[in-house]
């Protein structure tokens, strides 16, 4: 609706009514503008799906633009290597790491604050060394998060995927 509020790591959402006949979106200067025809029924399931699709497109764009380079920067800083980075639309996992050290990241990461995005990226990078959640894995997580792994893990649980 006109009062829709949403803030992501890189943009805020601005949904508004317009005299135009069609929906359109534009990501500009940290704002995702979604224009809706003046008679739009926001309770309509088709409208809800369209708005969600627009938001997913913007999240995917931002995730592809920012996450691979951020992951590689963190990898370099902490001495990790990964073979590939992919962005996908997972509804159940923030990220995953394959035995070949390929890291998959959910576009929903862009809904998190940056310190939690970094936590997830570091979590997946730690899996390039420890493929399970053993004590060695958590010791490594504590090392790269300056002893805050458990605190960050608890904070992450407060967030939901798109």
Language-model features, listed with the residues they occupy:
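Active-site-proximal or metal-binding-adjacent scaffold patches in catalytic folds
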Residues: 1-118, 128-162
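Walker B beta-strand of ABC/ABC-like P-loop ATPase nucleotide-binding domains
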Residues: 121
């Amino acid at each position: 609706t006109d009062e829709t509020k949403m803030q992501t790591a890189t943009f805020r959402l601005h949904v508004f009514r317009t005299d135009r006949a069609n929906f359109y979106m534009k990501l500009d200067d940290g704002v995702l503008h979604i224009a809706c025809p003046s008679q739009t029924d926001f309770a309509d399931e088709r409208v809800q799906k369209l708005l969600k699709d627009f938001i997913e497109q913007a999240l995917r764009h931002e995730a592809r633009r920012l996450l691979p380079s951020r992951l590689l920067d963190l990898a370099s800083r902490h001495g990790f290597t990964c073979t590939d980075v992919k962005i996908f639309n997972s509804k159940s996992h923030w990220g995953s790491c394959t035995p070949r050290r390929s890291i998959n990241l959910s576009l929903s990461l862009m809904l998190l604050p940056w310190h939690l995005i970094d936590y997830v990226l570091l979590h997946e990078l730690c899996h390039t060394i420890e493929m399970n959640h053993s004590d060695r894995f958590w010791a490594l997580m504590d090392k790269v998060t300056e002893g805050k792994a458990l605190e960050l893990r608890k904070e992450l649980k407060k967030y939901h995927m798109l």
